[in-house]
Amino acid sequence: LLVISTIIDFTVGQKLYKCQESKNKKRWLLLSMFSNLGILAVFKYYGFFVESFAPLASIFGGNIDYLHLNIILPVGISFYTFQTMSYTIDIYRGRLTPTKKFIDFAVFVSFFPQLVAGPIERATNLLPQIVKRPMPSKSQIEKGLVLIITGLFKKVMIGDAAGRIVDHIFLQPDIYKSPELLAALMLFSIQIYADFSGYTSIARGTAKLLGIELMKHFEQPYLSQNITEFWRRWHISLSSLLKDYLYISLGGN
């Protein structure tokens, strides 16, 4: 699937750049959108939707016969799907010139440090760095090692430790009192942050060792004073991508 998405969007990028007519450009862009979102919908959300709507239909006397698919969720499908779509959208908007080398685009799509857990990098930021093939500076190596160590600490020492306590309490919640359950919920929120933030720190640190700069993914979200600020500081790459490519396109500001 990664190879299919890479081939489709590399080809679409070349066609978009060469197209002069607006109608044809839209057709190529739609090909990219439907291909990527279609693959994502089938492999990540097919089971969820059919298992959710089948019982709902039976309540109203309906009967939905759906195909049972033993789908194995591909690693990182959400991240590279949005990443390749940013490439074709930016070319369509005139913000990016497509890369001429397929290998450069393939590395951009499958860049291993951030493929599994992000951050979701835009083509305008990551692709030019890959094309230049930079050598890491001494500062990048030092900062990269610090990020990797910090990420491992957050993931193993905080996230995993909190997870063991949370799993133990959630396994038999009826034997615990309200304060203990409340503490477990708070620990669960810490576990989620430590896991995601830890993975991201490791990804950013590994990229620095390769001379590549990735964007921040989290900015101390639990110190936010309101929901809006929390949204801006949690999963930054996804929230900013949705704002720029969806919200503003629909008329937001």
Could you tell me what each predicted segment is?
Residues L1-N253:
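Membrane-embedded transmembrane alpha-helical bundles that form the catalytic cores
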